[in-house]
């Protein structure tokens, strides 16, 4: 296929038009008085959002060169979202400022490689200073403040703070759509996995359609049980103890399932069978997690164990097990704390090594189930459009809060970027490197300027006053007052600010050092089909 090629100034100008188109659409959402953007959807109602990365992903431009520029900045938003989960609009604003300022200098004859060096030096210094001024997050109220700022909703802030308090920092907090109008929190204590009872005849509570086992023994195996003789020895031992039994196996079927159901209905013993969660290697790992949590063993041929040799000593124990049609929850497993801690450490090590987003999510879930529990925030709203928008905001707030727990908090509203201004300005450099540093200095002002503009104020006036203020004092765009940002609860996670700056600088440096751009040539439109008017089939009338 033929290609279009543009060089130097012409190439960069075309891409800059794309950068500006995307960034201008995204930056109207910045700050407490930022506006929304409406996105057309092929199916269903339009999506109304103020989430930078969601807007950036939707933008596709007709001109191939402009589109490349737009996609580069969308990459900044996307990468920041992957690393920190929030701050995508800030990252976009920073990238646009660095690219525009840099391009002016390249056009005036500056060497792009020198500019790149200066940009990298400035960003390294800014990040070091951010680490110095960040404060560790302490207590439920600090967590609530971070979440409330991100979601622009105090009620959401309180919900997220409560969820994190209940399940711990390692706990899993998921979002679901609620059937009602209100947003509420539902916490599942203990370990839950998505497998229900093998037969509805096993339930103990017909109103709730669930089976509740108090102080049960738990048989854990990766084998399929189809013959009752295989588990008869261990079954007899459990009956003698007078305790209920939970069987977690690859499957329980045929004669084995029929015998268990008949004896359950007769009242001989209380037993519930469920399928093992997960698939393949993940199934083995999850069964091992359950075994460690309950102090039992996984009965598997890989370890030379078969079901006939199982005894009550090899079974797990728990304070309570609740089995519904779709889920099984094990509460108060009696496993040893040392073993559980060791397992958690093992999963954390795997988390650090994995590069797959899917694996990371699954490992995080396993970690949460062992460490604390799972909290579900059920998001409610009056309309579907509002529900989608609210869900996106809560997701950002959740990510922000996790980032704050990880690396601490800094003054919000773009103030922290201005607080590192002096440190960056003090770097000694010459020539194009010094110009590169000035590009970053100009970009550091941009988020505050944009927040002020969105609040209907003159951005440059706010920026100039902020340069003279003490560290931590900033402009509250919601009220129009100058306040101590940390004391007023206007905070950003340091990780979000750091990621936004790093990713923006990375793409800006790549952009400025671009000398040629190659794109597919648009294909000429195919000629229209000829008129088919003369090809009537009247002569075929006799074939009826």
UniProtKB/Swiss-Prot annotation:
UniProt binding sites for ATP: 29-32, 86-90, 413, 476-478, 492
Pfam families listed in its UniProt record: Cpn60_TCP1
Catalytic activity: ATP + H2O + a folded polypeptide = ADP + phosphate + an unfolded polypeptide
Organism: Bacillus cereus (strain B4264)
Keyword field contains Isomerase: yes
Subcellular location, principal: cytoplasm
A GO CC annotation given for this chain: cytoplasm
Complexes and interactors: Forms a cylinder of 14 subunits composed of two heptameric rings stacked back-to-back. Interacts with the co-chaperonin GroES.
Record-linked InterPro entries: Chaperonin_Cpn60_CS (IPR018370), Cpn60/GroEL (IPR001844), Cpn60/GroEL/TCP-1 (IPR002423), GroEL-like_apical_dom_sf (IPR027409), GROEL-like_equatorial_sf (IPR027413), TCP-1-like_intermed_sf (IPR027410)
Name listed for the protein in its UniProt record: Chaperonin GroEL
Enzyme class: isomerase
UniProt keyword annotations, A-Z: ATP-binding, Chaperone, Cytoplasm, Isomerase, Nucleotide-binding
BP terms from Gene Ontology: protein refolding
EC number(s) stated in the UniProt entry for this protein: 5.6.1.7
Disulfide bonds: none
Family that this chain belongs to: Belongs to the chaperonin (HSP60) family.
PANTHER family given in the database record: 60 KDA HEAT SHOCK PROTEIN, MITOCHONDRIAL
One function term, GO molecular function aspect: ATP-dependent protein folding chaperone
Domain of life: Bacteria
Described function: Together with its co-chaperonin GroES, plays an essential role in assisting protein folding. The GroEL-GroES system forms a nano-cage that allows encapsulation of the non-native substrate proteins and provides a physical environment optimized to promote and accelerate protein folding.
Annotated localization: Cytoplasm
């Amino acid at each position: 296929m033929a290609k279009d090629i543009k060089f130097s100034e012409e190439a960069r100008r075309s891409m800059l038009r794309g950068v500006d188109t995307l960034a201008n659409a995204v930056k109207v959402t910045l700050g407490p008085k930022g506006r929304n953007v409406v996105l057309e959807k092929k199916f269903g109602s339009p999506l109304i959002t103020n989430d930078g990365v969601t807007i950036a992903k939707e933008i596709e431009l007709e001109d191939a060169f402009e589109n490349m520029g737009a996609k580069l900045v969308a990459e900044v938003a996307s990468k920041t979202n992957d690393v920190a989960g929030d701050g995508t609009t800030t990252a976009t604003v920073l990238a646009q400022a660095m690219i525009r300022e840099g391009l002016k200098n390249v056009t005036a004859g500056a060497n792009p490689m020198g500019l790149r060096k200066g940009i990298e030096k400035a960003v390294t210094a800014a990040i070091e200073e951010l680490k110095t001024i960040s404060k560790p997050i302490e207590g439920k109220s600090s967590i609530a403040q971070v979440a409330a700022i991100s979601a622009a909703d105090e009620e959401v802030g309180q919900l997220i703070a409560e969820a994190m308090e209940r399940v711990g920092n390692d706990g899993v907090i998921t979002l679901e759509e609620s059937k009602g109008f209100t947003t509420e929190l539902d916490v599942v204590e203990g370990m839950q996995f998505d497998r229900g009872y093998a037969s509805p005849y096993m339930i103990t509570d017909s109103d709730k359609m669930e089976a509740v086992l108090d102080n049960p023994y738990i048989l854990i195996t990766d084998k399929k049980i189809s013959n009752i003789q295989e588990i008869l020895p261990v079954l007899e031992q459990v009956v003698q103890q007078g305790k209920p039994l939970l069987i977690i196996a690859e499957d329980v079927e045929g004669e084995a399932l029929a015998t268990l159901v008949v004896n359950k209905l007769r009242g001989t013993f209380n037993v519930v069978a469920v399928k093992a969660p997960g698939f393949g290697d993940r199934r083995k790992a999850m069964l091992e997690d359950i075994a460690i949590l309950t102090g039992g063993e996984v009965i598997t041929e890989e370890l030379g164990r078969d079901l006939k040799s199982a005894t009550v000593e090899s079974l797990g124990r728990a304070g309570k097990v609740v089995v519904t049609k779709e889920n099984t929850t094990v509460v108060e497993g009696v496993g040893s704390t040392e073993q559980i801690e060791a397992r958690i450490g093992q999963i954390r090590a795997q988390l650090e090594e994995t590069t797959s987003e899917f694996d990371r999510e699954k490992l995080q879930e396993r970690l949460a189930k062992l460490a604390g529990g799972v909290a579900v925030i059920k998001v409610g709203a009056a309309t579907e459009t509002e529900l989608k928008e609210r869900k996106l905001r809560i997701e950002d707030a959740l990510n922000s809060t996790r980032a704050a727990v990880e690396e601490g908090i800094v003054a919000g509203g773009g103030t922290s970027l201005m607080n590192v201004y002096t440190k960056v300005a003090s770097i000694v450099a010459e020539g194009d490197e010094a110009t590169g540093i000035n590009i970053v200095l100009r970009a550091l002002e941009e988020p505050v300027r944009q927040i002020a503009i969105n609040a209907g104020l003159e951005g440059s006036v706010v920026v100039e006053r902020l340069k003279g203020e003490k560290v931590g004092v900033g402009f509250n765009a919601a009220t129009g007052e100058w306040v101590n940002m940390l004391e007023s609860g206007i905070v950003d996670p340091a990780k979000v600010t750091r990621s936004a700056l790093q990713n923006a600088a990375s793409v800006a440096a790549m952009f400025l050092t671009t000398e040629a751009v190659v794109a597919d040539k648009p294909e000429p439109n195919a000629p229209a089909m000829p008129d088919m008017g003369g090809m009537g089939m009247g002569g075929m009338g006799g074939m009826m």
